[in-house]
């Protein structure tokens, strides 16, 4: 069976890897670089070469069981990381989740508002866990839930909204539209509403270390620099057109791309999938890799792995302290910042680029449920982290679920993955998909 995978993020890589021994699989990527959000930049830091991740950075044993098994199968080396969190307000108000940083400003020790803020966090954790168990928050947005329980602006602006915005790379006002049940489920699963938190890890040498191992396993099945531009019906077949017109025929095609990218490729004959995908949106985030501490909290004691700098405008400004996250040399301060109103100093900036992230709301959740119901019909499969909560484990699960549905195999017992049978019509008719691509 010939299968094409379009897109080389975690979903496409895992799908192609799981299919490599059971099918004639080809992986297409429009860029020359393979890996999607698994992106490692090499910086020249005063003559010293340092590898820095700017997309996927960390994972944990509790919430990423398949990713851990994937890394074990690839023999990927990993190490401990840190996941502390800080908020810095334009008014000068700052705090971080580590003990030293919680009272980074000594005035917080004696500030009744700060103690009320701390009690509000505990109250949120208690009520959210209770209502999660009772399922009373179904079809309720986070904003409506916060209103119902009377959480004040201090709690919203300095804890729950910046934390949610940082996790999902989403403007704070959009977080108010996030489905409350999904929000609480994520916080509970990641132990963010509990005293005991999971230990986080990072890939030694950067995420490109695992990408290189997957690419090596796939060999000449990888076709970089091949952009698929159109997907349409062609009788009982499906035609995929790329930028230079070379043609290939496959039995199944997996579009392992962002939802908006898949939407742009699909022709009118796939209007059912197009209709669903229109409800799932992505948002660009401007990212800088730099060494400018001006984009960190003012108090050094408040510095954390994740630092939200609240600013005017709708975009969140988030700075990752990469030395803490990836155990990089402290003598070489390195930061990755998303969406600052004022970019880092030019002479302290190594590179800038854009990553797009999925935006989640109730219509998007409903659309994903419908896509899962029809996935594979007509030989067309959709996969991506956007089909879950947008994280690396979600992308891996989506890719593996699709691959296992088509007979792929992995050397572990998959967790929380439910393969579906390829639709009988496709199997019976042997419908082919035609791909027009650049690398014959």
What label would you give each PLM region?
Residues 185-243, 248:
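Helical element adjacent to the flavin cofactor pocket in flavoenzyme catalytic cores
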Residues 2-27:
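N-terminal Rossmann-like FAD-binding beta1-loop-alpha1 element of flavoenzymes
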Residues 20-43:
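Glycine-rich FAD pyrophosphate-binding loop
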Residues 41-67:
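N-terminal glycine-rich dinucleotide-binding loop that anchors FAD/FMN and/or NAD(P) in oxidoreductases
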Residues 227-358:
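Mid-domain catalytic core of redox enzymes
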Residues 42, 98-99, 103, 315-440:
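Conserved flavin/dinucleotide-binding core of flavoenzymes
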Residues 61-177, 184:
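Mobile amphipathic helical/loop "lid" adjacent to a hydrophobic cofactor/ligand pocket
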Residues 11, 33, 260:
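Conserved Rossmann-like nucleotide-cofactor binding loop
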């Amino acid at each position: 069976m010939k299968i094409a995978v379009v897109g080389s993020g975690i979903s496409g890589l895992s799908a192609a890897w799981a299919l490599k021994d059971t099918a004639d699989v080809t992986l297409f990527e429009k860029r020359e670089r393979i890996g999607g959000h698994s992106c490692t930049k090499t910086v020249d830091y005063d003559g010293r070469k340092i590898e820095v991740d700017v997309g996927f950075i960390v994972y944990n044993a509790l919430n990423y069981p398949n990713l851990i098994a994937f890394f074990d199968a690839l023999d990927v080396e990993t190490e401990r990381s840190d996941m502390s969190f800080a908020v810095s307000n334009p008014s000068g108000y700052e705090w971080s989740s580590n003990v030293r940083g919680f009272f980074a400003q000594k005035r917080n020790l004696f500030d009744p508002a700060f103690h009320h803020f701390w009690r509000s966090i505990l109250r949120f954790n208690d009520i959210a866990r209770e209502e999660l168990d009772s399922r009373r928050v179904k079809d309720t947005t986070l904003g409506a839930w916060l209103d119902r329980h009377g959480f004040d602006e201090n709690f919203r602006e300095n804890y729950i909204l910046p934390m949610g915005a940082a996790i999902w790379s989403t403007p704070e006002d959009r977080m108010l539209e996030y489905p409350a049940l999904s929000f609480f489920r994520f916080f509970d699963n990641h132990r963010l509403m509990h005293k005991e938190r999971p230990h986080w890890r990072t890939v030694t040498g950067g995420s490109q270390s695992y990408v290189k191992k997957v690419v090596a396993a796939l060999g000449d099945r990888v076709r970089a620099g091949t952009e698929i531009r159109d997907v349409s019906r062609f009788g009982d077949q499906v035609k995929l057109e790329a930028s230079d017109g070379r043609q290939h025929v496959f039995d199944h095609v997996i579009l392992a791309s962002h939802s908006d990218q898949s939407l742009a490729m699909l022709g009118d004959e796939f209007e059912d999938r197009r209709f669903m995908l229109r409800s799932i949106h992505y948002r660009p985030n401007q990212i800088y890799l730099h060494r400018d501490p001006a984009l960190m909290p003012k108090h050094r004691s408040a510095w954390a792995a994740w630092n939200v700098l609240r600013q005017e405008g709708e975009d969140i400004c988030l700075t990752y302290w990469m030395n803490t996250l990836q155990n990089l040399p402290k003598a070489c301060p390195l930061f990755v910042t998303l969406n600052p109103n004022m970019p880092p100093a030019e002479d302290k900036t190594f590179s800038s680029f854009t990553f797009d992230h999925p935006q989640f709301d109730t219509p998007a959740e409903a659309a994903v449920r419908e896509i899962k119901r029809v996935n594979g019909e007509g030989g067309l499969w959709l996969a991506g982290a956007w089909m879950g909560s947008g994280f690396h484990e979600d992308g891996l699960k989506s890719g593996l679920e699709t691959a296992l549905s088509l007979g792929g195999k992995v050397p572990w017992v998959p967790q929380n993955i439910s393969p579906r049978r390829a639709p009988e019509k496709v199997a019976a008719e042997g419908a082919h998909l035609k791909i027009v691509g650049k690398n014959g």
